[in-house]
């Protein structure tokens, strides 16, 4: 999720009317900038493209922007129409180390760990008790405080349509 929604937003589709995704319209909009797009294949590459100014702006994970800023690179984050997506921690059924994995998840999602993680990475905590342990100035900079124009990716839609969107996406990239 992300690029298709961004293309539709750029083409004037209101955030509350994104789904179902109009793929024809999205790819038509992407066609207008295709020759100027630099695709990155990992978070570190997105940072390098911005740090070197090879890419003057981009759609980047906010934690990578935090790391750039913490390293002294002159970057700023625009939260206008920021697109959020869900993530999950899972333990596969039949895991040999299920107990250790569950202990890790409990520790990693504890209020203290999530507050520390937010400070280090710039990612918002998932534990609702974490913000009261955080510096209020830090909390103001995190993604969950940037909701005025936030766009939530419809993860159910993506789960149901991922294969079809993926086929269309890869065909578009290849041409």
Where are these regions (language model features)?
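Extracytoplasmic ligand-binding site segments that recognize negatively charged/polar headgroups
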Residues: 1-54
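Solvent-exposed loop/turn segments at secondary-structure junctions
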Residues: 1-3, 62-66, 82-84, 96, ...
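Sec-exported extracytoplasmic/periplasmic mature domains
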Residues: 8-13, 34-35, 51, 55, ...
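Periplasmic-binding protein-like
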Residues: 27-32, 69-95, 130-131
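Short, hydrophobic alpha-helical packing/hinge segments within bilobed ligand-binding/sensory domains
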Residues: 46-49, 65, 101, 114
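A ligand-binding cleft/hinge motif common to bilobed small-molecule-binding domains
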Residues: 57-74
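Mature extracytoplasmic/periplasmic domains
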Residues: 92-150
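Extracellular/periplasmic bilobal clamshell ligand-binding domains
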Residues: 134-175
């Amino acid at each position: 999720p992300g690029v298709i929604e961004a293309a539709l937003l750029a083409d004037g589709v209101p955030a509350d009317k994104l789904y179902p995704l109009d793929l024809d319209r999205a790819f038509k909009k992407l066609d207008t900038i295709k020759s100027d797009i630099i695709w990155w294949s990992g978070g570190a590459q997105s940072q390098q493209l911005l740090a070197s100014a090879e890419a003057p702006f981009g759609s980047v994970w906010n934690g990578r922007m935090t790391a750039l800023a913490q390293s002294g690179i002159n970057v700023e984050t625009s939260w206008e129409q920021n697109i959020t997506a869900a993530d999950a921690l899972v333990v596969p059924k039949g895991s040999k180390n299920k107990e250790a994995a569950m202990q890790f998840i409990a520790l990693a999602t504890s209020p203290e760990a999530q507050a520390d993680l937010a400070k280090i990475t710039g990612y918002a905590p998932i534990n609702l008790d974490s913000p009261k342990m955080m510096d209020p100035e830090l909390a103001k900079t995190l993604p969950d405080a940037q909701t005025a124009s936030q766009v939530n990716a419809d993860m159910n839609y993506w789960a149901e349509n991922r294969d079809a969107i993926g086929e269309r996406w890869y065909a578009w990239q290849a041409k």
